Every structure is written in C-alpha cells, then in structure tokens.
A protein has these predicted regions:
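Membrane-permeabilization and membrane-interfacing ectodomains
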Residues: 1-229
Length: 229
C-alpha cells in the first residue's frame, strides 16, 4: 500500500518489493500464449496491437515488402509471462483530479489515467516453414509443453527437424540483459527463449508489458482499437 500515490513513491515501493527475499520466480501471475496462421507480414500487427513497421522491427529484407511471406506457411505467436502487477485503487471520492473544477474543465477531452501496469516478459514469434500449417502448429505447441533436459527441448525427431529448418524470428521484451527488447533468430534462440523463460528474479523482474486505463469522468474501463493497413 502506498500512502501518498505518485510516480516517485510508486517506484520507491516497487524497488523495495523487488529487493524482498520473497520476490522470486516461482510466483508468476500467469503464462499464456496465442497464435494464428498468416500469409502477409502486416497481419503480424495484430500481435503488437498497433500499426508498426513489421519489416523494420523483424529485420525482414526490403525485397519482400510486397507483403507476402517467403515460405509456404506462416505462424505468428505472442507468448506472455506476467510476473506481477502494480495496481492503483480507484479514487475514494471518484475523482482522479485534486478538485471537481479540474475534472469539469477537461471533460470535453475524455481524459484517461493508467490504473495498472503488469510487468513480465513477452515474445513475439514469427515462424515460416515449407511444411503445412497443421504440422507447424503441432511442432510449436509441443515446444511449449515438453520437458527440457540439459537446456534442450525433448522434441520428437520430426518436430525438431521442422523447427530447425524453419525461419524463426523472436522479438523478446523483458528478458535477461540490459536491452528492453531484442530480436533473435533461429531454432537455437527459440529453444533458449522457451527453456530459460520460466522464472524471474530481482535481477530480471521483467518490463512493463501491459497497462490498463480508466476514464477520469467515471472510472470506467477504457479500450481502444486499430485497423491494419
């Protein structure tokens, strides 16, 4: 509980929580993933939730800006490891501003405020393969569920060969290292991402991967949408 909410007090409290001996990697809020087939690179904007330049972010050769994927099958996925959330209570009097006049003066703008921030790790994965979609989907789902021994996923020979031959790109947010986000490629990096992603620590607590907003007018939930090009 933060007695006097504010940016400084929030980060101070967060720092104390991270340094606590009880702050360990066995208490993640959740691990979840979603995936879908794609044929054009711009479809991957759905994973990012915005109109971004997929070619720049995933370092796809400019010659493919016609949009269609290079290989027979494409699968993109978003893997989320939610470690913990920082949540602000609703204002006791219902007004996020200091007084009613400030709320009234901004009502025509429909202002919103950030109500919660979730820290964790996220991977946006692109897999292109000459195999059919059902085979790619099966291999991908298996990679997320099989055991790892000695840092290697215990995949069957067929699934491992498929993933080794596939073109895999992973944009990782919140992993180990000083970079907030980094792009890695290939089966070995895909395997490393899966095997090493189960825990977090005070050294690797994660980064903000989600936030929720509320309208200042009545504290109802704010939502948005976008249209891909």
């Amino acid at each position: 509980v933060i007695p006097t909410p504010g940016v400084v007090s929030m980060y101070t409290s967060l720092g104390k929580a991270v340094e606590s001996p009880k702050f360990s990697g066995q208490q993640s809020l959740s691990f979840e993933y979603d995936f879908r087939q794609f044929s054009y690179y711009n479809e991957m904007k759905l994973a990012f939730g915005g109109n971004i330049n997929i070619f720049n972010i995933l370092k796809i050769d400019a010659t493919y800006e016609s949009g269609k994927i290079k290989q027979k099958t494409g699968l993109f996925a978003r893997i989320l490891q939610k470690n913990f959330s920082v949540i602000m209570d609703y204002p006791t009097d219902g007004n996020i501003f200091k007084n009613q006049s400030d709320l009234a003066a901004t009502s025509h703008l429909s202002p919103v405020y950030i109500n919660s921030v979730t820290f964790g790790r996220m991977g946006i994965i692109s897999i292109e393969s000459e195999s059919n979609y059902e085979e790619v989907k099966k291999a991908f789902k298996l990679a997320l569920t099989v055991k790892a021994v000695g840092g290697e996923l215990q995949l069957d020979a067929t699934s491992k060969e498929l993933l080794e031959k596939a073109e895999i790109r992973i944009l990782v947010y919140g992993g180990a290292g000083s970079e907030v986000a980094k792009l890695v490629m290939g089966f070995d990096k895909f395997q490393e991402f899966i095997v090493n992603g189960g825990e977090f620590s005070k050294e690797v607590p994660g980064v903000p991967i989600f936030f929720t907003c509320n309208y200042a007018s009545d504290n109802s939930i704010f939502s948005t949408s976008f249209t891909t090009n």
